């Protein structure tokens, strides 16, 4: 057992790297990831030790409701959601709709068991010329996870009919790969 009486961790604030979560899980230590915003009195969902799914932020806390808008945005409402921004009716109208749903600005999905998975930020999406919304951070993080030789990756395609990426390599990683593959001293340019 990890740390004597420690049974689990709770993670929030920023997305938890799934490799880290899986590593702790393999050691018998679950990290219960949660989700919330200042506008929802902090915690709104959390994985439970008895109902846990890696890669998600869990189920809604009691009294909270979640749904996904047509554009993929996560909407929430419940007793912990703010009534509005102080002295800022324009910002309130942008964040809360007439039915009391808080528009979080996050993109996500709810699976058939009710677990919420966050996938991106709405403001980070771009739209191709054929109308498809693309979440570049998913592509970027997946590619970087598959290729240890990449230093930076930028996916773009706003108003184009294709998506492309600008990739820069990690010089140290490439030199190491070249040495291991009989190409030491060769240029990677």
Model-predicted segments: where are they?
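Conserved loop-to-beta-strand segment in the C-terminal subdomain of adenylate-forming
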Residues: 158-181
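Core catalytic subdomain of AMP-forming adenylate-forming
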Residues: 96-112, 129-155
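Residue-level signal for inorganic ion chemistry
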Residues: 13, 66, 114, 143, ...
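Alpha-helix/helix-capping structural signal
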Residues: 14-15, 80, 172
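Gly/Ser/Thr-rich phosphate-binding loop
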Residues: 1-52, 65, 148
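Conserved ATP-binding/catalytic segment of the ANL
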Residues: 60-69, 73-128
């Amino acid at each position: 057992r990890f740390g004597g009486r420690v049974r689990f961790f709770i993670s929030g604030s920023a997305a938890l790297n799934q490799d880290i979560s899986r590593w702790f899980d393999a050691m018998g230590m679950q990290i219960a990831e949660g989700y919330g915003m200042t506008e929802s009195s902090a915690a709104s969902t959390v994985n439970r030790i008895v109902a846990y799914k890696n890669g998600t932020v869990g189920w809604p806390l009691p009294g909270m409701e979640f749904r996904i808008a047509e554009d993929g945005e996560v909407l929430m409402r419940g007793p912990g959601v703010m009534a509005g921004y102080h002295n800022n009716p324009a910002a309130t109208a942008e964040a809360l709709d007439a039915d009391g749903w808080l528009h979080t600005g996050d993109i996500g999905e709810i699976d058939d068991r009710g677990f919420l998975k966050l996938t991106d930020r709405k403001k980070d999406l771009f739209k191709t010329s054929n109308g498809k919304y693309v979440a570049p951070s998913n592509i970027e993080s997946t590619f970087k996870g598959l290729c240890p030789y990449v230093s930076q990756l930028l996916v773009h395609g706003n108003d184009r009919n294709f998506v492309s990426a600008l990739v820069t390599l990690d010089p140290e990683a490439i030199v190491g790969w070249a040495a291991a593959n009989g190409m030491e001293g060769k240029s990677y340019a």
